[in-house]
Amino acid sequence: MARVTVEDCLTNMDNRFQLVLVGSKRARQLANGAEAHVDWDNDKPTVVALREIADGHVGREILEEQPEPVLDFEAEASALMEEEAAKGNADAGQGEGDAPKTPGQDG
């Protein structure tokens, strides 16, 4: 696990503010499953992001990339539940009089 310093990263960045923006965006991408350009070496995503910046694999152009759409899992789950409930109600209404009779039951 190689130590990464701010000075190592600043050789590829204009200033510390930009380093923070690029590093945080790249760390977020790594945490969400993006492929790393360097070995993980059992490091956290922030350290890997800084190592990528220091090695020149990631630069300021990452700030121009469009963010991935955020999935609203709660809204999606709620919509699916409503759809299933509506489907269940529709199924329950079909063939109400067609229930199978049990032996010994007069109809």
UniProtKB/Swiss-Prot annotation:
Subunit note: The RNAP catalytic core consists of 2 alpha, 1 beta, 1 beta' and 1 omega subunit. When a sigma factor is associated with the core the holoenzyme is formed, which can initiate transcription.
Catalytic activity, EC: 2.7.7.6
UniProt GO cellular component terms: DNA-directed RNA polymerase complex
Catalysed transformations (reactions): RNA(n) + a ribonucleoside 5'-triphosphate = RNA(n+1) + diphosphate
Gene3D superfamilies: 3.90.940.10
Keywords recorded for this protein, A-Z: DNA-directed RNA polymerase, Nucleotidyltransferase, Transcription, Transferase
Pfam families: RNA_pol_Rpb6
Purpose: Promotes RNA polymerase assembly. Latches the N- and C-terminal regions of the beta' subunit thereby facilitating its interaction with the beta and alpha subunits.
Keyword Signal among UniProt keywords: no
Region (Disordered): 81-107
This protein's record includes keyword Signal: no
Record-stated family: Belongs to the RNA polymerase subunit omega family.
HAMAP family according to UniProt: RNApol_bact_RpoZ
Source species of the chain: Alkalilimnicola ehrlichii (strain ATCC BAA-1101 / DSM 17681 / MLHE-1)
Gene Ontology molecular functions: DNA binding; DNA-directed RNA polymerase activity
InterPro entries named in the record: DNA-dir_RNA_pol_omega, Pol_omega/Rpo6/RPB6, RPB6/omega-like_sf
GO process terms (BP): DNA-templated transcription
The protein's name in its UniProt record: DNA-directed RNA polymerase subunit omega
